[in-house]
């Protein structure tokens, strides 16, 4: 295997060689086929695999998988990510187009989500697995027939599980590519934020609620329906973890807009290319193009301090980009933790605001009352039994449904003038 920059060799060679710092790739210089590091690596690879010795099919396959010369890097984790994500995508498209109605509640009430059943692109969704299945692993071979598997919502579980495996493998593939190119693994670390959010919503929450029927429908309107139902059940808007997630996402978007506008406003004009005298590792001097600044970091910081306040500055561009990456990643992590806690009905971290306050003996509703009324309304809409409507078109309600009956003795006591 080709020698890496960390002093390791692959299992194809069976031995290790010490790492030569002279072969390390300079990340600041463009990666071209004429670089000395690439030439050394190629020369070493030719020494390890002489042209006269034919390579076995397995060795050629391993070199093709781990080669960074491919147009798209495959990698060993890509061998797992590509088929799982492709399976999830194909089944999702087929289910959106032609999946039959699903017994989502396990009571015989069918819910349709496909386009052929009358839904449009907004209302179409992959309906979650039936509540009768619960958390059981429900592959195709566990059902008596394909029709039974479709009616019980088997495609939803297939899509979700393959998708989760695929995105985790994709994140590990990013780490693998960074390792091959001798880069730091922060790209893979940043991608853990959407992975954590997806796992929390699609896997952890159904597990905590006792069935995949509580999962998010895979569609546009299904996503918003899940959000409103989640708010009604757990009041996630009052969770500090969710609020930190909102701060991270919106704050990260604000910082990206500020950074992009400052950089665009301070871009330097392209100067004439100047040459600088540099000394190579062999001790000889050579002319090398001198790097020119892309934008003026000092002018951007001066503008920012003048516009906001004197302390609003960063010491270097590295600190700027670290904040741009760390703020949204930390926010999404905290929101995912909030969903995980809500999945197991652990709502003690949520803020409990008073339902009302009294000012001069006047009841003043708070925003908490508005949220509570919205939650109750969503609960009412989600009830399984629809209300009965009268001839006038208004729903009919019985007083006994909302007020407990009063006993005769209690009623006579309340109406007695001597009480």
UniProtKB/Swiss-Prot annotation:
Q: Please identify the protein, giving its name as recorded.
A: Light-dependent chlorophyll f synthase
**Site: Tyrosine radical intermediate. Where?**
205
Per the record, where is site Stabilizes free radical intermediate? 234
Describe its membrane topology: Multi-pass membrane protein
Q: Which Gene3D superfamilies match?
A: Photosystem II protein D1-like
A single Gene Ontology biological process assigned to it is: photosynthetic electron transport in photosystem II
In terms of superkingdom, the source organism counts as Bacteria
What are the alphabetically sorted keywords of the record? Chlorophyll, Chlorophyll biosynthesis, Chromophore, Magnesium, Membrane, Metal-binding, Oxidoreductase, Photosynthesis, Thylakoid, Transmembrane, Transmembrane helix
GO cellular component annotations, sorted alphabetically?
photosystem II; plasma membrane-derived thylakoid membrane
Self-association and partners: Homodimer.
Where along this sequence does the record place binding of a chlorophyll? 162, 242
Residues annotated as transmembrane:
73-90, 162-177, 186-200, 241-262, 323-337
The record's listing under SUPFAM superfamilies reads: Bacterial photosystem II reaction centre, L and M subunits
Family to which this protein belongs: Belongs to the reaction center PufL/M/PsbA/D family.
What this chain does, per the entry, is described as: Synthesizes chlorophyll f or chlorophyllide f (Chl f, 2-formyl chlorophyll a), probably by oxidation of chlorophyll a or chlorophyllide a and reduction of plastoquinone. The reaction is probably light-dependent. Chl f absorbs far red light (FRL, 707 nm in 100% methanol), and is synthesized when cells are grown in FRL, where it provides the advantage of extending the spectral range of harvested light in terrestrial cyanobacteria. Chl f synthesis is probably light-dependent.
């Amino acid at each position: 295997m080709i020698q890496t920059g960390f002093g390791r060799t692959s299992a194809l060679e069976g031995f290790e060689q010490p790492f030569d710092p002279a072969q390390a790739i300079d990340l600041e210089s463009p990666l071209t086929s004429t670089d000395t590091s690439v030439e050394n690596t190629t020369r070493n690879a030719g020494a390890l695999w002489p042209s006269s010795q034919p390579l076995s099919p397995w060795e050629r396959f391993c070199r093709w998988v781990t080669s960074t010369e491919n147009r798209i890097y495959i990698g060993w984790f890509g061998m797992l990510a590509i088929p799982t994500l492709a399976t999830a995508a194909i089944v999702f498209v087929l289910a959106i187009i032609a999946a039959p109605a699903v017994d989502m509640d396990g009571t015989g009430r069918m819910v349709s989500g496909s386009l052929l059943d009358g839904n449009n692109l907004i209302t179409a969704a992959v309906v979650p697995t039936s509540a009768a299945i619960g958390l059981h692993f429900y592959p195709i071979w566990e059902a008596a027939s394909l029709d039974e598997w479709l009616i019980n919502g088997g495609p939803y579980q297939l899509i979700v599980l393959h998708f989760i495996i695929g995105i985790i493998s994709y994140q590990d593939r990013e780490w693998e590519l960074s390792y091959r190119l001798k880069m730091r693994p922060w790209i893979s670390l940043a991608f853990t934020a959407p992975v954590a959010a997806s796992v929390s919503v699609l896997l952890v929450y159904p597990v905590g609620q006792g069935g995949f029927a509580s999962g998010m429908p895979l569609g546009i309107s299904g996503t918003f329906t899940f959000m409103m139902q989640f708010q009604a059940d757990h009041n996630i808007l009052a969770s500090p973890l969710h609020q930190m997630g909102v701060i991270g996402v919106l704050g990260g978007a604000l910082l990206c807009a500020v950074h992009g506008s400052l950089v665009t406003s301070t871009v330097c004009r392209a100067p004439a290319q100047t040459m600088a005298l540099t000394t190579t590792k062999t001790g000889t001097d050579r002319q090398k193009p001198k790097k020119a600044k892309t934008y003026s970091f000092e002018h951007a910081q001066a503008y920012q301090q003048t516009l906001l306040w004197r302390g609003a500055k960063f010491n270097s561009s590295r600190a700027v980009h670290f904040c741009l990456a760390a703020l949204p990643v930390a926010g999404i992590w905290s929101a995912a933790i909030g969903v995980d806690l809500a999945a197991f009905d652990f709502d003690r971290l949520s803020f409990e605001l008073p339902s009302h306050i009294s000012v001069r003996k006047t009841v003043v509703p708070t925003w908490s009352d508005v949220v509570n009324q919205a939650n109750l309304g969503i609960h009412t809409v989600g009830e399984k039994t629809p209300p009965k409507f009268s001839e006038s078109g208004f729903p009919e309600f019985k007083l006994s449904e909302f007020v407990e009956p009063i006993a005769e003795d209690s009623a006579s006591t309340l109406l007695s003038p001597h009480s």
